[in-house]
Amino acid sequence: KGKKVTWADPYGNVHDLDYVLERNGTNDVTGTPVAFIEMAWRRYTKHSRNKAQEIQGAILPLAEKYQWSNPFLGAILAGVFTDGSLEQLRSLGFHVLYFHYETIVAAFASESIDVAFDESTPDTVFRKCVQQIEKAPVSAMQGVKDHLGNANKANIDKFVASLKERLDRMVEKVIVIPLYGRSNEFATIDDALRFLDGHSVYEGCGDFRKYEVFISFTNGDRVEGSFKDKTKVREFLQFVAKQ
């Protein structure tokens, strides 16, 4: 209860996270992350966007560090979050599972526990509610859990399905493109366009520059890499194969 896992981003910053699913990890050895999932509760909309930014600030640098494994990014949110804060996370690649405040209140009310509160709620009322929850029998809390799960079943199923797709994904296609030719630099867009108009394309022209590698998966994910030698290409492909 209350435990966190700590991961370091490529800039040397450490982040305490809620859930990380990894392959080949142990209590002593860090594995390869396949999912980062953060959880948060907010009662008021004025705090929701800040929390969304806090989540992305912790997770996106880690996603960058482990881009070869292309981990699942998840956020499980409860309470009151604005549509803008939710879309902000989704636009950055997060899968969001959101439990509306009203469904939480209704779930506890199903077991005769009133958890509704706002800024005007007296501390005495709040403490009484907390004590009621702490003393509630296991059967009552199971009832709350069941009610909340049923009320949000469609969203839960969608989130779990997306996570399962990531964990079960298979390589669908691998593209390796050897690039040749000299570099051409231009001061303006018009100069670049004139170059393209007069450029003749044929395979193997010029010196070898690098390999571009693109891998697509059955769940729609995609990873790519750019390498100057075959050894690095091989390492990249073997790493992905182990995922």
Regions found by a protein language model. Name each.
Residues 12-22, 46-51, 115-125:
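Phosphate-binding glycine-rich loops and adjacent basic patches that engage nucleotide phosphates
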